[in-house]
């Protein structure tokens, strides 16, 4: 364990994307977090974009969806992504941002529009981040789907999605190639609720030194 990351979340996710005053508070908070991470010798943020409470990136759960289109929300959220990244880089220009989920989760169900995805608007926020990020910024798609992975083929397929397929899902493909890396999260006591966590017989755990 050589690197430290400060965890930051999007919860509770109740802030209105179009509320400038509220977003001023959000940006101030992340600016403070960036200073703490930098001065604390952290590599950067572990940015958990999972919607544990409200659907911050879900168009169907936006309070102004009856008066503003998906594209209008996308444009505003892209702006917020730029503002967020600029504020963070102001205090931490060489930050590494680990994302629990990247562009893949923003994709729509097959045959449907991105507006129907529960994380559809996340892609716009990430686009804004890429547009504004400093040359030294690294963004890592840490691919939470990999928590239970054991097989190399699973990692290979995920790597291809992050490094090749996801380039097609951003409006900033060149900056994506320059700034985005692949990284896989592993949940060491994965499935402990189902199989428990055995300290005497490691072979009974999802992950074992034998596998």
Language-model features and meaning:
Residues 1-211:
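Glycan-processing catalytic domains of CAZymes
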């Amino acid at each position: 364990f050589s690197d430290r990351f400060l965890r930051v979340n999007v919860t509770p996710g109740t802030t209105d994307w179009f509320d400038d005053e509220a977003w001023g508070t959000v940006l101030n908070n992340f600016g403070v977090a960036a200073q703490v991470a930098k001065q604390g010798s952290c590599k950067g943020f572990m940015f958990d974009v999972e919607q544990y409470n409200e659907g911050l990136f879900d168009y169907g759960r936006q309070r102004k969806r009856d008066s503003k289109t998906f594209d209008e929300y996308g444009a505003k959220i892209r702006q917020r992504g730029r503002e967020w990244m600029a504020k963070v880089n102001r205090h931490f220009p060489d930050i590494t941002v680990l994302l629990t989920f990247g562009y893949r989760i923003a994709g729509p169900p097959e045959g449907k529009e991105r507006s129907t995805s529960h994380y559809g608007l996340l892609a716009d926020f990430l686009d804004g981040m890429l547009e504004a990020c400093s040359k030294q910024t690294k963004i890592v798609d840490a691919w939470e789907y990999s928590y239970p992975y054991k097989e190399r083929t699973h990692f290979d397929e995920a790597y291809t999605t992050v490094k090749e397929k996801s380039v097609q899902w951003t409006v900033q493909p060149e900056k994506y190639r320059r700034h985005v890396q692949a990284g896989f999260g592993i949940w060491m006591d994965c499935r402990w609720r189902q199989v428990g966590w055995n300290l005497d017989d490691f072979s009974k755990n999802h992950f074992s030194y034998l596998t």
